Design a protein with these regions (language model features):
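A short, Lys/Arg-rich alpha-helix, primarily the initiator
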Residues: 1-20
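Residues within the helices of the helix-turn-helix
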Residues: 12, 23, 53
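Short, charged recognition helix plus adjacent turn
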Residues: 13, 38, 64-80
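The alpha-helix within a helix-turn-helix
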Residues: 15, 26, 56
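Short alpha-helical DNA-recognition segment
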Residues: 19-38
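The DNA-recognition helices of helix-turn-helix-type DNA-binding domains
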Residues: 32, 43, 70-74
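Short, basic-rich loop-to-helix N-cap that marks the start of a DNA-contacting helix
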Residues: 43-57
Length: 80
């Protein structure tokens, strides 16, 4: 799995888990809804760490919690 796919899937999972809409996350994180949608729909394949931190803050989790999943632990190497 590619890193951007893992980020997208994790974000979708957290939105469902926290029962948040894109609009709610945008308000809580101060990240524009268009930016969140670009990540979710694959237009943005390299969201910045600051953006991810803001999204995590909006969901009430840490960056460590965001990345601490089996999916991220087993990501394939991007550069071969």
């Amino acid at each position: 799995m590619k890193t951007y796919t893992a980020v997208r899937e994790r974000l979708l999972c957290l939105l469902e888990e926290k029962r948040m809409s894109v609009h709610q996350l945008a308000i809580e994180s101060a990240v524009p809804p268009s930016t969140i949608k670009n990540i979710l729909y694959g237009k943005s394949k390299n969201p910045g760490i600051v953006t991810l931190k803001m999204l995590c803050d909006g969901m009430g989790i840490t960056l460590t919690e965001f990345f601490q999943t089996d999916t991220f632990r087993t990501l394939e190497q991007e550069i071969k």
